Amino acid sequence: MLYIDSIKQGVTTVFDHHASYGEIPGTLHTIAEESKRLGLRSCLCYEVSDRDGEEKCLQAIKENADFISECEQRKDPMLAAIFGGHALFTISDKTFDRMVEANNGRTGYHIHVSEGMNDVYDSLQNYGRRPVQRLQDHGILGPKTILGHCIHVNTAEMEIIKETGTMVVNNPESNMGNAIGICPVLQLYKRGILLGMGTDAYTNDMLESLKVALCSQRSQNCLPNVGWCEVTDMLFKNNAKIGEKYFPDTLGVLKPGAAADIIVMDYKPFTPFSDENIDGHMIFGMTGRQCQTTIAAGKTLMLDRQLVGIDEEAENAHILEAAKKLWGELNHRTY
């Protein structure tokens, strides 16, 4: 469903941080096959955590390592792997060492960092270090590592992130929905940190995230004239730069040799529209649901709002039945 909804809202590239501790082995391969079938570009990882016990933790580490090996062998330009980790308060030093050993320098890491203050308190109380410092101690940081959230990072941690070339992804709707704070986007951006925009699965509409990111930064800083350049750069420039760390094609631009990722929006402007004010039209006038056609790597995935080569009704029926089955098993009732 994630992939179908992404196509319908003009998304061509997905970085997914997966967890399903009831079924670990082979899950990333299964997701990769669906991504391939539907035609999107995907960078996948499994969420390593100690919270379900050592056996599950070791399985999660192996799932990441196995999928990295699979991607190395497949050499598919539409598929990539990154090593996943949950929040630091569920990962011990021993587990970090195991992750680094299993990865063996092949990829970066995709991990939740300082999403809530409990992550900071846990690191200080149990390890005597703040979260970003712990990651640095274990060799997790670097130009191919993505830190999700980074709401409660201090200035010293920001400098470490900058010095190591580590990437940060802001997830504004998720953070506001969980009432855990607002990412210090302006401070991170000012330091030259590669800062992208994500969703944390809250939505598949990146234009929705764009609007919320702008409003949240202005509200947090009590200034009505900040954030415009930062949030538009994050979505339209930096996300492509992050994608290029893991995929071989040039992304996010229309020029010879670049990936042919193109969307057509059903939008009628009521004020003059040009390259000088397109950001304003996208923030205030457009939503992902206005996407009419989606093309990824030159392949048309949706044309005139009709998915190409996909029976959407059949897919939706299958997903609904799977959801009913899952809910039934969890709640011991029939839906």
Features from the language model and the residues they span:
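Hydrophobic alpha-helical hairpins/lids featuring a short glycine-rich hinge
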Residues: M1-G22
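Divalent metal-coordination and catalytic microenvironments
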Residues: G10, S35, F83, H112, ...
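Metal-coordinating catalytic core of metallo-dependent amide/deamination hydrolases
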Residues: H18-I151
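Glycine-enriched alpha-helix->loop->beta-strand junction motifs that scaffold or abut catalytic
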Residues: G39-R41, A102-G108, I140-P143, I160-V169, ...
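Catalytic core of soluble alpha/beta enzymes
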Residues: E115-G139, P143-T166, S174-L186, T203-S209
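His/Asp/Glu-enriched, well-ordered alpha-helical/loop segment
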Residues: D137-I140, K144, P184-P269, I283-T287
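Active-site microenvironment of metallo-dependent hydrolases
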Residues: L235-Y335
